[in-house]
């Protein structure tokens, strides 16, 4: 279930963060979410999962989630406790996979430092950075917000089916 606004501490990454560094290929044979969580961002920040706290936010540059179209990448981030990903842009397949697994995200070009506490308002399409202002991002369409609110595509479809039965 999506929380809004999302307030959390920033983990900052650059451009072209590919799915191979988000979750290295050697972990793809498992379906154990704890293994995904334990190795999230390992390819670029080996200490990430030891230091990240539930509710933290990843802020990145352009083309976040590029590379192979592995659904495990947003799952690893989500199960590591990351509440949201904000990036200048996302690889399209990562963007949809994140929505489908219920990982909130927003395209926005914001100024912040690692460790800053920021507020992401998905409903308004804004990111508030104390001392730097409010940055306007790309607000998600309502149908994608509905999927996130329901916890991902599978939960969203189950909810719709249950409503049809009533």
UniProtKB/Swiss-Prot annotation:
Q: In which pathway does it act?
A: Organic acid metabolism; 2-oxosuberate biosynthesis
Spell out the disulfide connections. none
Q: Which keywords does this Swiss-Prot/TrEMBL entry list? A: Lyase
Where is motif YLRT found?
27-30
One Gene Ontology molecular-function label: homoaconitate hydratase activity
One GO biological process term: coenzyme B biosynthetic process
List the residues marked with site Critical for substrate specificity: 29
Documented EC number(s): 4.2.1.114
Q: Does the keyword Cell wall biogenesis/degradation apply?
A: no
Give the reactions, separated by semicolons, that this protein catalyses. (2R)-homocitrate = (2R,3S)-homoisocitrate; (2R)-homocitrate = cis-homoaconitate + H2O; (2R,3S)-homoisocitrate = cis-homoaconitate + H2O; cis-(homo)2aconitate + H2O = (2R,3S)-iso(homo)2citrate
The record describes its quaternary structure and partners as:
Heterotetramer of 2 HacA and 2 HacB proteins.
Give the function comment from the record.
Component of a hydro-lyase with broad substrate specificity for cis-unsaturated tricarboxylic acids. Catalyzes both the reversible dehydration of (R)-homocitrate ((R)-2-hydroxybutane-1,2,4-tricarboxylate) to produce cis-homoaconitate ((Z)-but-1-ene-1,2,4-tricarboxylate), and its hydration to homoisocitrate ((1R,2S)-1-hydroxybutane-1,2,4-tricarboxylate). Is also able to hydrate the analogous longer chain substrates cis-homo(2)-aconitate, cis-homo(3)-aconitate. These reactions are part of the biosynthesis pathway of coenzyme B.
The Swiss-Prot or TrEMBL record describes its family as follows: Belongs to the LeuD family. LeuD type 2 subfamily.
Name it. Methanogen homoaconitase small subunit 1
Source organism per UniProt: Methanosarcina acetivorans (strain ATCC 35395 / DSM 2834 / JCM 12185 / C2A)
The organism's lineage? Archaea, Methanobacteriati, Methanobacteriota, Stenosarchaea group, Methanomicrobia
Gene designation per UniProt: hacB1
């Amino acid at each position: 279930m999506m929380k809004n606004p999302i307030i959390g501490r920033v983990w900052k990454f650059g451009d072209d963060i590919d799915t191979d560094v988000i979750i290295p290929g050697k972990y793809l044979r498992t379906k154990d979410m704890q293994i995904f969580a334990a190795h999230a961002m390992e390819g670029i920040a080996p200490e990430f999962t030891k230091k990240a706290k539930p509710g933290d936010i990843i802020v990145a540059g352009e083309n976040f989630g590029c590379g192979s179209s592995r659904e495990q990448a947003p799952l690893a981030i989500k199960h590591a406790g990351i509440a949201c990903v904000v990036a200048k842009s996302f690889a399209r397949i990562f963007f949809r996979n994140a929505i489908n697994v219920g990982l909130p995200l927003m395209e926005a070009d914001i100024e912040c430092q690692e460790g800053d506490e920021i507020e992401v308002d998905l409903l308004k399409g804004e990111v508030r950075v104390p001392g730097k202002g409010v940055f306007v991002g790309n607000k998600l369409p309502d149908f994608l917000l509905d999927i996130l609110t329901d916890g991902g595509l599978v939960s969203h479809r189950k909810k719709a089916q249950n409503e049809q039965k009533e």
